[in-house]
Structure formats: C-alpha cells, structure tokens
Amino acid sequence: MMETLYDNNGTPVAYLDKDDGNTFFLWNGVPVAYLDKDYTVYGFNGMQLGWYFNGYMRDLKGYIVGFNKQSASIEVKASPIKSFKITKPVKRIKQIRRVKPIWKRNNSAICLSQFLANGIN
C-alpha cells in the first residue's frame, strides 16, 4: 500500500511504501527514510528525522513538515508517475530515539523535500 506525502503547499514530494519495509521514497525512486517503531522516522544514514503519526510528518520540534491526503486541510496537487525504485541502502546504526515533543499546529520552517533529504547516506 502506498501513501502520498505532500509538503505544506499541497505538492506531492514523496510516498510511503508500506509493502516495502515502510520506506519513504522520493518520486524519482530514491529511498530516503523509513518508519520505525513508535512512529519514528529515520534516515538510512541513522539520523532521526522526526515522526509520522496520524497522517502528519513532524520535525524534531513537533512542527508539521508534511501530511497525507486524508490529513490535508488544503487542496493537494495530483501525484506524479513513480519512477523505478533505486535499491535501498543498508540502514546505518540509529541515533537514540528522542523524546516526542508536544505536537504543534504550525508548519515547520524546513520543507518536506529538505527534511527527507537529511536522511540520505
């Protein structure tokens, strides 16, 4: 099952492939992160990026970085055609999971594409 993720402008940036190890892919097929226990999002480089819970991608401070269609409060754009997936890299040793902050209603200062790019090896 695939779930599209949109940035705070409603542009599709990535998708979560639940059938491929809960991996987040960019539309060009690059695997950038994965969903771990307790809704924690880690990059393949081992960095904790944030959390994905109830359709919202949140940064380490609890601000909204992106969302799925069901959680959208704005009109979202059509998803592009997916490219072939690039082989996933080996997961590096994970950082110690941070304590979840209080969820904020505001958007993060970082865009979803940059947020996910922080997880690339």
Where are these regions (language model features)?
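Short low-complexity stretches enriched in small and charged residues
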Residues: 8-17, 21-25
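Short "repeat-start/strand-capping" segments in structured domains, especially the N-termini
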Residues: 1, 18-23, 36-40, 53-56
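Long terminal segments
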Residues: 1-12, 47, 53-121
